[in-house]
Design a protein with these regions (language model features):
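Active-site phosphate-binding strand-loop segment of PLP-dependent enzymes
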Residues: 112-181
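Glycine-/small-residue-rich active-site loops that bind phosphorylated ligands and cofactors
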Residues: 21, 39, 91, 114-115, ...
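Phosphate-binding glycine-rich loop
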Residues: 37-84, 95-102, 107-110
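Nucleotide-sugar donor-binding loop of glycosyltransferases
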Residues: 83, 89-91, 110, 160, ...
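N-terminal "arm"/small-domain region of PLP-dependent enzymes with the aminotransferase-like
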Residues: 1-37, 42
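Generic structural signal for small/hydrophobic residues in well-ordered secondary structure
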Residues: 29, 51, 69, 85, ...
């Protein structure tokens, strides 16, 4: 979305977030592009290994986008056309696309106006017999209220794209797909 700046008549983006990339990141991307391997190759293997080591997991798999990651996770959870998937109304369109890709019915829920995370009270009102999952992004690095969401007894898919490396507390649960703010 753009707004018009009447002072000097230039279009300006509404501030949301800006990338913070430095020369080191630019050089790394340039090296990958010049290698001829932008989808696979040594850089991707190194990234996957470093990511897995950083978070103490056996494997990490790089995919082409957040949409692809969510799509694969929903498939792994067995979500399909017979399901509804609850997700926050204020979120990147990748969630909605992933839900559509598996044929499930998207069900938007309200957000907490202070954290921009999904509102557990509103989620509870939207649960039906067809609810197969709740997608829970941790917005702007703020952890969503998983304690309350877990009590709803619906499988949860955490979207940690905005909270990589964040800490909440370690949970070992069979009804969660994803990890603790990885």
């Amino acid at each position: 979305m753009v707004i018009s700046n009447t002072t000097n008549s230039i279009a300006t983006f509404i501030p949301h977030s800006r990338p913070t990339l430095g020369d080191e990141e630019v050089r790394a991307v340039e090296a990958v592009i010049k290698s001829g391997y932008i989808a696979e190759g040594e850089a991707v293997k190194q990234f996957e290994q470093a990511f897995a080591e950083k978070f103490g997991v056996e494997q990490a798999v790089a995919v082409s986008s957040g949409t692809a990651a969510l799509h694969l996770a929903l498939l792994a959870m067995g979500i399909g056309p017979e399901h509804e998937v609850i997700f926050p109304s204020f979120v990147c369109s990748a969630l909605l696309h992933a839900v559509h890709y598996v044929g499930a019915q998207p069900v938007p829920a309200e957000i907490d106006p202070l954290t921009y995370n999904i509102d557990p009270d509103d989620v509870q009102k939207r649960i039906t017999a067809r609810t197969g999952a709740i997608i829970v992004p941790h917005m702007f690095g703020l952890a969503a209220d998983l304690d309350r969401l877990l009590k709803l007894d619906v499988p949860i898919l955490e979207d940690c794209a905005q909270a990589v490396g964040g800490k909440r507390r370690l949970l070992q649960r069979d009804d969660m797909f994803g990890s603790d703010l990885l």
